[in-house]
Amino acid sequence: SAIWFWMTPQSPK
């Protein structure tokens, strides 16, 4: 999804 975009400063991949 597009939640961690603002949740975490680092990219998931």
UniProtKB/Swiss-Prot annotation:
Domain of life of the native organism: Eukaryota
EC number(s) recorded for this UniProt protein: 3.2.1.14
Catalytic activity as recorded in UniProt: Random endo-hydrolysis of N-acetyl-beta-D-glucosaminide (1->4)-beta-linkages in chitin and chitodextrins
GO molecular function: endochitinase activity
Stated family: Belongs to the glycosyl hydrolase 19 family. Chitinase class I subfamily.
General function of this protein: Defense against chitin-containing fungal pathogens.
Name of the protein: Endochitinase 2
Species of origin: Capsicum annuum var. annuum (Red pepper)
